[in-house]
């Protein structure tokens, strides 16, 4: 096909500048800006390539969805020809289209080595249906996310804005040590699951923060809260292979798997709770205060991880986390 694009004087002025060359002023057009003018003028003729994707079918089988080439043109040649034509009588330029490969091709996807489960976790849901809505929305947004070698995964970035316009609802959270509600309440369960995927696969723990209070549905110490603008959950893929996150809600649980090629041998362990602190009574002056009785004591745990390959230790680390007691809450 073909198309005619007519640039207005205002458009051409916005992409033009004069530069000194051999004692003369010569017209130079910005290739990128001029190309944008052409693309907007011929939207049906030109198209972006479509990147390949790696999807986990039925949570059992990795599948490469092939890339599609786009239709484009030589931007540099267009700018040169247009600058030359601007000084001639007819001011017309003919430019041939060409096939433009996607940024991430089918071949690129196949080289990622996504073939097996390298870590997994399942955690039980609460009986709060509203909270479960957030987890269903959240897992759908995160599922089939590809983390390339040396790439960092950010859960907040993968989820996008946590607001009502994007399907999230208000549910229970812990704010300043007290129970409250906020948009996206419950997403810390997804944060916990995805943290465990990266941690158990030997990936770099870039950022995670356990809860201030312990919830028995999560692995002690190996869990992660999430709060937009404050606490993210991030890990970095430190292997030569791509990794795809598969996560979903079913049968009263949040399931998560990390698909890749096994690279690291990983051993994790959590100490028994120590340094226990008995609960007390706390006064919550907040307007949305929820009174509650005392629960379990506070305590500290130490989480350790040894990451090795071919018998050589790559990392031998540990961290401590202290949980607050579940205090009796009185509203004032």
Question: Predicted regions span which residues?
Answer:
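Well-ordered beta-sheet/strand-loop patches within structured domains
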Residues: 1-332
